[in-house]
Amino acid sequence: MPRLAPSRAAGASSKSGKPHAIRIIGGDWKRTPLPVLDLDGLRPTPDRVRETLFNWLGQRLDGQHCLDLFAGSGALGFEAASRGAARVLMVERHARAAGQLRANQQRLDARMIEIAEADGLRLAASLAPGSFDVVFLDPPFDADLGKALAVAVPLVRADGYLYVEAGEALEPAAHEPLSGWELVRQGKAGAVHFHLLQRENKE
């Protein structure tokens, strides 16, 4: 995958359980609305953030393999599939949220998407290293980000990307798993800090 030059980018859910919708920003399913459950703690990645992220990634992900490790609404994974990803593995431990992901997958006839109802950390630890071109990491803000990074980082191919959403700005030097990684893009939208990382070029 191409390297990006380091740069600084500009840049409440209810307990009702009733459905609402996100929309796909670009690609084959552009402007398609997808129902998502309005569950406590479920934070779909905002349209503005997704648009910025996929601009960073070059709009299309043709032929690439992607992992959405804490899928939630599936906003990132469905967006990647819409933009040509050959395989998207979405992992979600919440049964109802995983059920909604499967319903949306069937609605789109998205055969490149695999839904795993499982604990993200445990499943990631069982996957082969270097399996993915892009790993999307958007854990709950109260989760241990260090543990998530420890299992996610080895899954990224040598020239791949790691995307991280968090409740505060990410400092790679503060996380041992990110040793040798470079923060190439970052931004903030509301309470969401978002970051794109790639391994440092040793050439």
Please report, for each region that a protein language model flagged, where it lies by residue.
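Class I S-adenosyl-L-methionine-dependent methyltransferase catalytic core
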Residues: 1-203
